[in-house]
């Protein structure tokens, strides 16, 4: 994969919006997973912390930790895209992410569900500050992170 053009402005938009969301992680973690289940109710079975629950648990530390990881890694990816022109995640981290997603039964369309939930959560959290530029920056960063994980999953399969 060649170098990706990710601007300083895009990086700043991702970082600034993440700072806003970080101020109420419990709320936005819950919103994020509620969105995933609204878009794809069957996805519930992919998350160990959701399987045995009829609703998204409010005070589940695993739920919060997973949501934070998705947002934080996407934010870090934005920084890497701007600085390096590519996703720079440690091989061991990518191997782990590829392995865990493969074992959990995650397939390509699931990444789109997570992306849509991520964007809906950003829209909810940012209110009037959410716009096409913010959406585009987060989308591009997330797409590259998802591609890196999917590539690792394919390598693990073969």
Swiss-Prot record:
One of its GO terms (cellular component) is nucleus. Heme b binds at residues 48, 62, 66, 101. It is found in: Cytoplasm; Nucleus. Keywords: Cytoplasm, Heme, Iron, Metal-binding, Nucleus, Oxidoreductase. Binds 1 heme group per subunit. It holds the Pfam family Globin. Its EC number is 1.7.2.-. A motif (Homodimerization) lies at residues 38-42, 108-120. Induction: By low temperature but not by low oxygen levels, dehydration, heat shock, wounding or oxidative stress. It is an enzyme of class 1 (oxidoreductase). It comes from the Eukaryota. Its cofactor is heme b. It catalyses: Fe(III)-heme b-[protein] + nitric oxide + H2O = Fe(II)-heme b-[protein] + nitrite + 2 H(+). GO terms for biological process: fatty acid metabolic process; triglyceride biosynthetic process. Residues 5-154 form the Globin domain. Unable to dimerize. This is Anaerobic nitrite reductase AHB2. The lineage of its organism: Eukaryota, Viridiplantae, Streptophyta, Embryophyta, Tracheophyta.
